[in-house]
């Protein structure tokens, strides 16, 4: 009789745990932002960590913020995640660290007038060397890896976080 009494709470506990895990697995994007400990006012990505947010700019009525991904906002309270991975190349031996982005209104980089140009750290996993690379976009969402990367290479293990500026400086407030 003792064995049966112990089995019932164990079975109920297992069912309760399974139901909880199942409900958690079915979370949608609306419920993500109601999670405990998730910032409710400042931006946080749907999954993963944001690292160093960079490439913040105001352009054509929207705030644009880049990290490894991209979000847009019209009021700095409500955000639309555009992509979780904005800047990537095709080499699996390369990781990308943050940098900055700018709108090239005068086509000084040669990617087209009004192109988004992102500068970031290119990290070679095997050698641990860091260099600076760029990607460009004509819509601010789909970036093209510049085939001439790296654009600055000191062959150093400590060469991170480039900052670019231009005619489109960040506007806050």
Q: What do the predicted segments below correspond to?
A:
Residues 22-24:
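Sec/Tat signal peptide C-region and signal peptidase I cleavage site
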Residues 26-173:
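Beta-rich carbohydrate-recognition and catalytic domains
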Residues 11-20:
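Bacterial N-terminal signal peptides
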């Amino acid at each position: 009789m003792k064995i049966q009494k112990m089995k019932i709470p164990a079975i109920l506990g297992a069912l309760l745990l399974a139901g909880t895990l199942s409900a958690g697995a079915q979370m949608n994007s609306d419920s993500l932002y109601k999670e405990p400990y998730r910032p409710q006012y400042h931006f946080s990505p749907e999954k993963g960590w944001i690292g160093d947010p960079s490439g913040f700019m105001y352009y054509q009525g929207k705030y644009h913020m880049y990290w490894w991904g991209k979000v847009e906002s019209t009021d700095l309270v409500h955000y639309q995640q555009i992509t979780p991975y904005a800047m990537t190349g095709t080499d699996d031996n390369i990781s990308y660290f943050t940098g900055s982005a700018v709108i090239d209104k005068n086509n000084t980089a040669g990617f087209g007038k009004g192109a988004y140009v992102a500068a970031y750290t290119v990290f070679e996993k095997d050698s641990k060397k860091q260099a600076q690379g760029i990607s460009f976009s004509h819509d601010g969402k789909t970036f093209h890896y510049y085939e001439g990367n790296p654009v600055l290479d000191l062959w150093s293990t400590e060469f991170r976080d480039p900052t670019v500026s231009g005619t489109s400086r960040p506007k806050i407030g």
